[in-house]
């Protein structure tokens, strides 16, 4: 299997973040066992779980969308305009750097991107790109990898430069396509995202849903079958009823089945091909519709190296720090906070805490890191406003 492993992503120029975004996929801390990690080469491992936590409106979903954008380009080989419909989130110009391992080599790509108009439609294009590679034998330690990540890549040390491609290649290459496809065209892994399921949680199944999947989320379902290519042409039977539901509109299925069953079914079907190929599954607000213990099942699957043999990665955001207690490591948890200038800081939990014997959820919920929980003052001010409005109704609610 020729699967690509992302090691580091840097993005420069995203306005809501204070500094250049730096997202590590590799394990910065010592690896003592191989659960929840995948060996890439030498002492370099990648995390099978990456979590993003923080208060409401701090930038978790924005960060997840940016990660998805990069993975869709690098891993899936898609054009930038095919995968990013929130162009308003992006500045007029920005650049990103990605370090990854593929085909027994370490690669670094640095891409410069800008907005442009085509027939009054706002789009994005690549204006310059550089690619450099090195044999795996030259990077067998985290120190060497970090040196490779931090090395400035430009036209002087690049092996491939977009603007210097042969004219025939420039004619074939679309403005929205990265030159990285030259390298990664044989990659067997892929990225799938569930970003839209936060607000649009609709039932969609390709084949009959196995009872083993359905009964984890609703043990009263006897079967759920797909009868044709029509997404709403299903048959459903519950164990406690003789009635069989068939030939119903799509909205009916979303009403008769619980939101948790629908999301759980979707996540399960998304997980399987990702686990097979060592790819990436991106889930926003993973706790939506699902019991905490059900989320743990998915986390455990990605952490179990007997199931996740190819080092697939689950990347998720959450408002619930309690989920972090299911994770063995802290170098895979990104904590987002706002500074006094209302810019978002992104830091690894492992860089913020010194002790490993404290529950991760306690650290976040106690606001010990400042900015990970509502302040005492804001809570008291809110309560006082509500109390005054209930008693005196000054604002006419």
Give, region by region, the residue ranges found by the protein language model:
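Switch/communication elements of ASCE P-loop NTPase nucleotide-binding domains
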Residues: 1-72, 244-374
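Phosphate-coordinating catalytic segments in nucleotide- and nucleic-acid-processing enzymes
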Residues: 1-24, 73-272, 276, 366-371, ...
């Amino acid at each position: 299997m020729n699967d690509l492993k992302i090691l580091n992503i840097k993005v420069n120029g995203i306005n809501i973040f204070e500094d250049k975004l730096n997202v590590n996929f590799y394990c910065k801390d010592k690896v003592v066992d191989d659960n929840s990690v995948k060996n890439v080469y030498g002492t370099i491992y990648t995390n099978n779980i990456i979590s993003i936590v923080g208060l409401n409106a701090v930038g978790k979903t924005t960060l997840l969308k940016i990660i998805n954008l990069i993975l869709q380009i690098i891993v899936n080989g898609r054009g930038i305009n095919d995968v990013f419909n929130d162009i308003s989130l992006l500045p007029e110009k920005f650049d990103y750097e990605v370090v990854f391992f593929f085909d027994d080599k370490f690669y670094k790509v640095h891409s410069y991107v800008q907005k442009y108009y085509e027939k009054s439609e706002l789009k994005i294009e690549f204006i310059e790109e550089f690619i450099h590679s090195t044999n795996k034998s030259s990077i067998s330690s985290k120190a060497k990898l970090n040196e490779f990540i931090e090395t400035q890549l430009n036209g002087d040390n690049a092996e491939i430069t977009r603007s210097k491609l042969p004219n025939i290649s420039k004619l074939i290459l679309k403005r929205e396509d990265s030159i990285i496809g030259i390298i990664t065209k044989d990659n067997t892994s892929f990225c799938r995202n569930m970003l839209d399921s936060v607000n649009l949680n609709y039932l969609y199944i390709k084949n009959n849903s196995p009872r083993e999947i359905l009964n984890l989320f609703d043990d009263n379902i006897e079967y759920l079958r797909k009868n044709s290519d029509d997404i709403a042409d299903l048959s459903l039977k519950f164990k406690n009823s003789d009635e069989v539901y068939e030939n119903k509109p799509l909205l009916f299925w979303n009403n008769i089945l619980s939101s948790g069953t629908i999301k759980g079914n979707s996540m399960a079907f998304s997980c399987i091909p990702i686990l097979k190929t060592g790819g990436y599954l991106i889930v926003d607000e993973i706790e939506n519709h699902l019991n905490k213990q059900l989320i743990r099942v998915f986390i455990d699957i990605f952490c179990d190296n007997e199931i996740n043999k190819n080092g697939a990665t689950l990347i998720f955001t959450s408002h619930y720090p309690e989920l972090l207690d299911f994770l063995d490591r802290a170098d895979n948890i990104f904590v987002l906070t706002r500074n006094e200038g209302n810019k978002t800081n992104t830091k690894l939990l492992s860089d913020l805490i010194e002790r490993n014997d404290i529950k991760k959820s306690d650290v976040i919920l106690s606001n010990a890191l400042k900015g990970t929980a509502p302040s005492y003052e804001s809570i008291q001010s809110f309560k006082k406003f509500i109390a005054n409005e209930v008693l005196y109704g000054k604002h006419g609610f």
